[in-house]
């Protein structure tokens, strides 16, 4: 066993395994994923507002009127602007499910606690005035969307931990045996639900006595802003990608773990770009969820489409040629488990090097392209991660060819990175096959 393999197995894999199995991180990941169907549906309507087809705008105006773009925005806003509320339910549901307690009740209580922590005030600018005032009684849509994700996460984890503790301590109302199960479960949730609401209410009253005024401001200033700066920077993104690739190298789904941590940051950046795109303003963010899914991980984590193409074109080994044929179909849809585990890349010191380096270089190249204005930034459109390259880059930028061109550039970069390492691996496999065919098992 090589020193590298021994260090990976003895030092890194145990820690990575514990992180991967951590129930709270799993709940964050799986709970936030619950928002994706709605976001993708909203993104379809967002794409329809900006199709670069001659005569398209005139046709839409003739059908829906001059405000057709605003009308297409209705389902966009309805899906994006409840992101935090859906996440509050989903995270609580998944965490309660992992504890074996009633997940539906936990999710409902989490939503109530989240809304209780959210001030029902909206800014209003009176006619003829240049300054806005806060008016009570309105639902603050911005806080129910991406801006409220951090609070939704914390509330969901906090409320579910209290909920399961009280349930497991059996501090509940017990109904007679003849009561229907659905009714019985609802009464079981009464005491933990009351305690959670009471605690969140008291916390809100205390916070309102401070300059912060709301939990959203506390979390935004103390947690959200620093993390957003980190996740929205080149250095922070390189670190996140490096850790993700290192976890994959141990056979652990790095995207699930790092995605669960960084999702609220990158989702928030995505939504900020979406709002700017709808308003026709400059897009503020580069590092969003789509930045990594569309431009960095072309072919899957580690940008392995380049490796598969190299296998198809340059393999001497029969095993590598066959694996390339099997892997090209999934790779075009950004699915690369057959390559990661079949080649394998996992626990393979030779191939781990380009597997880690390739996405780090494409992050840097794409950042340079977007920051200089040569490449359009992601427009906040949630293109499915399984969308084939070139098409996905075009759609994710709101119909800009530069998005597809950047994907092609990244593919060429990653081909150049993988090629020398693959040649060594392919030659080794070819010699092993030659030894078997010649009957000389000692040939290396």
UniProtKB/Swiss-Prot annotation:
One Pfam family recorded for the sequence: PTS_EIIC
Superkingdom, taxonomy of origin: Bacteria
GO molecular function: protein-N(PI)-phosphohistidine-sugar phosphotransferase activity
Membrane topology qualifier: Multi-pass membrane protein
Gene Ontology CC terms, in alphabetical order: plasma membrane
Transmembrane residue ranges: 31-51, 72-92, 104-124, 138-158, 187-207, 223-243, 246-266, 291-311, 349-371, 402-422
GO biological process, one term: phosphoenolpyruvate-dependent sugar phosphotransferase system
InterPro entries associated with the record: PTS_EIIC, PTS_EIIC_3, PTS_IIC_cello, PTS_Sugar-EIIC/EIIB
Cellular localisation: Cell membrane
Keyword vocabulary terms for this entry: Cell membrane, Membrane, Sugar transport, Transferase, Transmembrane, Transmembrane helix, Transport
Ranges for domain PTS EIIC type-3: 8-421
NCBIfam families per UniProt: cello_pts_IIC, lacE
Written domain comment of the UniProt record: The EIIC domain forms the PTS system translocation channel and contains the specific substrate-binding site.
General function of this protein: The phosphoenolpyruvate-dependent sugar phosphotransferase system (PTS), a major carbohydrate active -transport system, catalyzes the phosphorylation of incoming sugar substrates concomitant with their translocation across the cell membrane.
Protein name: Putative permease IIC component YwbA
Phylogenetic lineage: Bacteria, Bacillati, Bacillota, Bacilli, Bacillales
Encoding gene (name): ywbA
């Amino acid at each position: 066993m090589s020193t590298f393999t021994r260090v990976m197995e003895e030092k890194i894999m145990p820690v990575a395994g514990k992180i991967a199995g951590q129930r709270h991180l799993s709940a964050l990941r799986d709970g936030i994923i619950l928002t994706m169907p709605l976001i993708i549906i909203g993104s379809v309507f967002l794409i329809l507002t900006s199709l670069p087809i001659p005569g398209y705008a005139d046709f839409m105006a003739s059908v829906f009127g001059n405000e057709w773009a605003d009308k297409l925005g209705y389902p966009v806003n309805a899906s994006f602007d409840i992101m935090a509320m859906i996440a509050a339910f989903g995270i609580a549901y998944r965490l309660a499910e992992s504890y074996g307690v009633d997940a539906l009740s936990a999710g409902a209580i989490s939503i109530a606690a989240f809304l209780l922590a959210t001030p029902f005030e909206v800014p209003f600018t009176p006619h003829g005035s240049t300054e806005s005032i806060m008016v009570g009684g309105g639902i603050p849509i911005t806080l129910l969307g991406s801006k409220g994700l951090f609070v939704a996460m914390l509330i969901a984890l906090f409320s579910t931990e209290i909920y399961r503790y009280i349930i497991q301590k059996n501090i509940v109302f017990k109904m007679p045996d003849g009561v229907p199960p659905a009714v019985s479960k609802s009464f079981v949730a009464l005491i933990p639900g009351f305690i959670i609401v009471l605690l969140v209410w008291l916390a809100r009253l205390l916070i309102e006595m401070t300059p912060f005024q709301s939990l959203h401001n506390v979390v935004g200033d103390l947690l959200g802003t620093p993390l957003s700066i980190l996740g929205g920077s080149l250095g922070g993104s390189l670190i996140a990608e490096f850790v993700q690739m290192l976890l994959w190298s141990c056979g652990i789904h790095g995207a699930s773990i790092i995605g669960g941590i960084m999702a609220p940051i990158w989702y928030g950046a995505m939504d900020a770009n979406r709002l700017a795109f709808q308003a026709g303003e400059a897009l503020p963010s580069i590092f969003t969820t789509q930045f990594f899914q569309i431009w960095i991980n072309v072919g899957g984590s580690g940008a392995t489409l380049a490796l598969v193409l190299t296998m198809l074109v340059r393999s001497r080994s029969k095993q590598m040629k066959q694996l390339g044929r099997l892997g090209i179909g999934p790779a075009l849809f950004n699915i690369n488990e057959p390559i990661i585990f079949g080649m394998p890349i996992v626990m393979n010191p030779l191939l781990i090097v380009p597997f880690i380096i390739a996405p780090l270089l494409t992050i840097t190249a794409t950042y340079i392209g977007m920051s200089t204005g040569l490449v359009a930034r992601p427009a906040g459109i949630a293109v499915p991660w399984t969308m084939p390259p070139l098409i996905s880059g075009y759609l994710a930028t709101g119909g800009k060819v530069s998005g597809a061109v950047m994907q092609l550039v990244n593919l060429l970069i990653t081909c150049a990175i993988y090629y020398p390492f693959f040649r060594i691996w392919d030659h080794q496999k070819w010699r092993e096959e030659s030894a078997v065919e010649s009957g000389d098992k000692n040939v290396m």
